[in-house]
């Protein structure tokens, strides 16, 4: 093998090319690779952060939905309680009104009974006097008639 100046010149050119590449070409390539690596890492971190925020948002939405359901159920229960209370109040008022009407009707009936008794006493007394008059076949004077009526009323 013949080592001559060409081989030596090729080695010098290769070393110059390696030095030039290391000095001027390699740093921008490394920087570009580092920037790309950093962008990828930032993107992955942002994706993880977004995923965590999405999960947190889902949890908040689930909690708010559960709260809304609970509030709705509570409102329905309150409305049912109010409806039952109103129904009970209406029922109580109706019963009180019915009792009042019944008491009023009983009082009116009692008054009518008393009035009818008084009327009947008067009619019975008049009939008794008339019957007594017919039996005695004589005229009874007014004072005797009044006394007889009062006496018959008292007896009845």
From Swiss-Prot:
Function, in words: F(1)F(0) ATP synthase produces ATP from ADP in the presence of a proton or sodium gradient. F-type ATPases consist of two structural domains, F(1) containing the extramembraneous catalytic core and F(0) containing the membrane proton channel, linked together by a central stalk and a peripheral stalk. During catalysis, ATP synthesis in the catalytic domain of F(1) is coupled via a rotary mechanism of the central stalk subunits to proton translocation.
Protein name, entry field: ATP synthase subunit b
Regions that span the bilayer: 7-29
Keyword Cell membrane: yes
Record's subunit section: F-type ATPases have 2 components, F(1) - the catalytic core - and F(0) - the membrane proton channel. F(1) has five subunits: alpha(3), beta(3), gamma(1), delta(1), epsilon(1). F(0) has three main subunits: a(1), b(2) and c(10-14). The alpha and beta chains form an alternating ring which encloses part of the gamma chain. F(1) is attached to F(0) by a central stalk formed by the gamma and epsilon chains, while a peripheral stalk is formed by the delta and b chains.
Keywords associated with the record: ATP synthesis, Cell inner membrane, Cell membrane, CF(0), Hydrogen ion transport, Ion transport, Membrane, Transmembrane, Transmembrane helix, Transport
First-listed, main subcellular location of the protein, grouped into a coarse class: membrane
Compartmental location: Cell inner membrane
Gene Ontology MF annotations: proton-transporting ATP synthase activity, rotational mechanism; proton-transporting ATPase activity, rotational mechanism
HAMAP family documented for this protein: ATP_synth_b_bprime
Domain of life of the organism encoding this protein: Bacteria
Family, per entry: Belongs to the ATPase B chain family.
GO cellular component: plasma membrane; proton-transporting ATP synthase complex
The keyword Transcription appears for this protein: no
A Pfam family recorded for this sequence: ATP-synt_B
SUPFAM superfamilies documented for this protein: F1F0 ATP synthase subunit B, membrane domain
Gene: atpF
């Amino acid at each position: 093998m013949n080592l001559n100046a060409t081989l030596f010149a090729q080695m010098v050119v290769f070393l110059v090319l390696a030095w030039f590449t290391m000095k001027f070409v390699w740093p921008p390539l490394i920087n570009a690779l580092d920037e790309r690596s950093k962008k990828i890492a930032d993107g992955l971190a942002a994706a993880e952060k977004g995923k965590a925020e999405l999960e947190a948002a889902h949890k908040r939405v689930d909690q708010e939905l559960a709260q809304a359901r609970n509030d709705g159920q509570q409102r329905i229960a309150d409305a049912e309680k109010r409806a039952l209370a109103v129904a009970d109040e209406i029922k109580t008022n109706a019963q009180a009104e019915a009792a009042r009407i019944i008491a009023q009707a009983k009082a009116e009936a009692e008054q009518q009974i008393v009035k009818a008794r008084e009327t009947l006493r008067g009619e019975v007394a008049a009939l008794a006097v008339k019957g007594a008059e017919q039996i005695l076949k004589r005229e009874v004077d007014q004072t005797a008639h009044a006394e007889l009526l009062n006496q018959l009323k008292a007896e009845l």
